[in-house]
Amino acid sequence: KGGFDPAYLYELVYVAKDPKVMGVGLAALRDTVSFFRSKAADSNGTPNPVAGRITHTLGQGTSQSGNAMKTFLHLGFNQALDGGKVFDGMYAHVAARQTNINTRFAVPGGGGGLRTDHTAFGQTAPRGLDKDYMDDISGRQGGVVKRCATTNTCPKFFLGLSGTEFWQLQGSPVLTDANGTKDLAQPDNARIYYYASTQHGGAGGTASIAYAPTRATYPTGTVVQFNDTFRALFLSLEDWVVRGTQPPASQVPKLADGTLVRPEALSFPAMKGLTWAVGGVQTAIPDFSYRGLYNNFPLFDFGPQYIPQDEAGIATVLPPRNLGRDYAILVPQVDASTGLTRSGIRSVEARAPLGTSIEFNYVATPGITDLANLTGSFIPFHKTRAARLAAGDARPSL
């Protein structure tokens, strides 16, 4: 009645019927991989075309499929029906959370972003990895590897995080306790790698930067990219699984050394007086103004028939009830000189930067204050010292 107000986010709740059977894909993935690696033939006598040729198996997923790999592991599907392992190694890339596969009316996916399915079921699964992880917000115990640790079927596990995961996808609870007061010790079979100064979608290089001033406040994208890093780490995972070669230690921001902080503690340098080409015309970039926006992480109650620690059951309270207890969100601290983050794996573009790659952006819609989904920002350096001093830009010049 009277139309929609763009200042609000609307969620439609309705009575549905005839839910599909969901979660079968987890069993299908388990049984398919197990068949190819260890069976001579299927139950109909059809020969396995690669019987005896597979010595090790690696599973990899990016973003939503990475979340699904974590759900696969969390729910115990890395134990084959014969008791053996399904995957010897697993790499969940830019995958901060889990996904909604195992509930009635499940909708696999769900962004969990501020304006992209903020109350997705996949938000309720444990973020901590360790089998003894204690969630002090919900009071629940047990992390992602709890089931596989019980059955001795845990894979060697890599988790990769871009910078956007911290701002928009609540990435920090995998690194700290739920209240954000101490760094977590990670399982021996796991490594976590933070790709410094990157956005969720990768890209990289100045050619990947686009600027639509009516859509985003700053040029969209990050020159810093994780593509080469991801490939190198995947080979490290293979070496760990196949040859027993220890991979690099986890590289993440930490509370202990001041590289993981509350959003309000960030300290960016002044970035002023720059332009970027829009349709062949040099267009002014607004002077950078840090607003401290991030996607919060409240504890939701979906009703007594929903089992959050199993990502299972029936949601009877929709929209879910906000219990008023939020998980702490922390973000990587930046270098006061360049604005690039201080921790994590720094690619060539971060070691020899052409400007500041920022892990978030803001929408440019008048009257709306919000993060620009999963995109980052790029603000170039001035070409000369004289130009940057005249503009009041505190960063180095090219």
Region spans (language model):
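C-terminal His-loop and adjacent cap/lid subdomain of alpha/beta-hydrolase
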Residues: K1-L398
